[in-house]
Amino acid sequence: MSDKILVFGHQKPDTDAIGSSYGFSYLSNHRPNGALNTEVVALGTPNEETQFVLDYFGVKAPRVVKSAKEEGVDTVILTDHNEFQQSISDIEDLTIYGVVDHHRVANFNTAAPLFMTVEPVGSASSIVYRKFLEANVEIPKEVAGLLLSGLISDTLLLKSPTTHVTDHKVAKELAEIAGVNLEEYGLAMLKAGTNLSTKTAEELIDIDAKTFELNGSNVRIAQVNTVDIPEVLERLSDIKAAINASMTANGYDDFVFMITDIVNSNSEIIALGAHPEKSEAAFNFTLADDHAFLAGAVSRKKQVVPQLTESFNK
């Protein structure tokens, strides 16, 4: 096996998954003491928002891999995730050298000690930025741009309840290094990810989707950002058909789909599967035609997953 270490974010990568992995790979390769031989890769192609970021800063998208072993590699670093079902296909057969994440730790174990940093901040990119400072490694403009974009994406330009008090300082400093106006660039970037008109229903429910094991149930939780929830709901029947087909094909017990209005900071929730009552209890609403409005909800990590976890555990 090669001595190379692959660095990647989760399946169906978002901007933070790609930004944090790109940044951490660069840092790992340029540490003054103990540099590693890493390559940033991805577990999927960039979405429209992420492609906007890559084009803006002139960065080539990481190549997509399906299996580390097929690459002749047996050691990996994970960013923006830790749960095995969200990772590379052969994760259980690999050595995990390190993890940089800002999510819950679950369905994760290793046979050997590792470097692991998990913090309740707005993005994995925020953590990577601080690691640059700790290592005293200069951040190139394009790397700063990718890290900034990961933070903007995950916190909806610092408006999400997942935003940590330290993220504001991180965003300001990264914007200065990247040479962008935080507000202007952030809005343009977020809007680039809201063009859903060209997406099929099958693509919509798969743009940003993660699988969670909740008390023995396999629950898929997906999210799309928009500036017009009613426009998306015009396609409700097609979306529900796509969700049902996905559950059948992939063995999901339940599927929760968040349609998030990034302007007004609300979401519409579509919930299908074996336990719709768990969603109703989690969010204290009543589903009508399998969907309901959830005021103030923009974060899957903080406003959906914990509530569903508690509901499924009852």
UniProtKB/Swiss-Prot annotation:
It is an enzyme of class 3 (hydrolase). GO terms for molecular function: inorganic diphosphate phosphatase activity; manganese ion binding. Keywords: Cytoplasm, Hydrolase, Manganese, Metal-binding. Mn(2+) 2 binds at residues 16, 80, 102, 154. It is found in: Cytoplasm. Its cofactor is Mn(2+). Binds 2 manganese ions per subunit. Mn(2+) 1 binds at residues 10, 14, 80. The keyword Electron transport does not apply. Its main location: cytoplasm. GO terms for cellular component: cytoplasm. Its EC number is 3.6.1.1. Pfam families: DHH, DHHA2. It catalyses: diphosphate + H2O = 2 phosphate + H(+). InterPro entries: DDH_dom (IPR001667), DHH_sf (IPR038763), DHHA2 (IPR004097), DHHA2_dom_sf (IPR038222), Mn-dep_inorganic_PyrPase (IPR022934), Oligoribo/pAp-PDE_c-di-AMP_PDE (IPR051319). HAMAP family: PPase_C. Belongs to the PPase class C family. This is Probable manganese-dependent inorganic pyrophosphatase. It comes from Lactococcus lactis subsp. lactis (strain IL1403).
